[in-house]
């Protein structure tokens, strides 16, 4: 099994969503002072690569700590479809991918590599997405 790290490294310079605070790293203890190093990290739950919990948009939705972590560890199919700003991946795009690379197995977790991660990480509003036709097609499999 090949493992893909989907995260963006967190630093004080990471772009943050407009209105969100930048992360702060504070030295709390040091080897010289207490024989160990310890840092405090303060950051928004929307810093870097993250999962939006249902609570983010639904008042009675589950909060991030209430979600079972095992649901985020999956075997997945990596589908490379280059996309431009504000371009949706369609059912037709997925069918074309399957013709070239083989059918996506039923029940698969699908990760799309659009090339967008190579773009500026300051543009939060025009990234590619999934068209409704594509989402319905994948759910039907």
For every predicted segment, state its role.
Residues 1-141:
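Active-/binding-site microenvironments in catalytic and ligand-binding cores
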